[in-house]
From Swiss-Prot:
The keyword Repeat does not apply. PROSITE patterns: RIBOSOMAL_S21. Belongs to the bacterial ribosomal protein bS21 family. Residues 36-58 are annotated as: Disordered. Residues 43-58 have a biased composition (Basic residues). PANTHER family: MITOCHONDRIAL 28S RIBOSOMAL PROTEIN S21, SMALL RIBOSOMAL SUBUNIT PROTEIN BS21. One of its GO terms (cellular component) is ribonucleoprotein complex. It comes from the Bacteria. Keywords: Ribonucleoprotein, Ribosomal protein. The lineage of its organism: Bacteria, Bacillati, Bacillota, Clostridia, Eubacteriales. It comes from Clostridium kluyveri (strain ATCC 8527 / DSM 555 / NBRC 12016 / NCIMB 10680 / K1). One of its GO terms (biological process) is translation. This is Small ribosomal subunit protein bS21. One of its GO terms (molecular function) is structural constituent of ribosome.
Length: 58
């Protein structure tokens, strides 16, 4: 879990900005989106191979 300490003279806006940046770097939102719906292992493999194919031909 990402957490920050708010300084004495720090505004809530800047603390919130730091928290959002820390969450983005940790990949929290992408992980939530990925786990939002169950994905069968066969579908995961298919997506992974299609992504590899796109990278190869790009």
């Amino acid at each position: 879990m990402s957490e920050i300490k708010v300084g004495e003279n720090e505004t809530i806006e800047s603390a919130l900005r730091r928290f959002k940046r820390k969450c983005a770097r940790a990949g929290v939102l992408s992980e939530v989106r990925k786990r939002e719906h169950y994905e069968k292992p066969s579908v995961k493999r298919k997506k992974k191979s299609e992504a590899a194919r796109k990278r190869k031909f790009k």
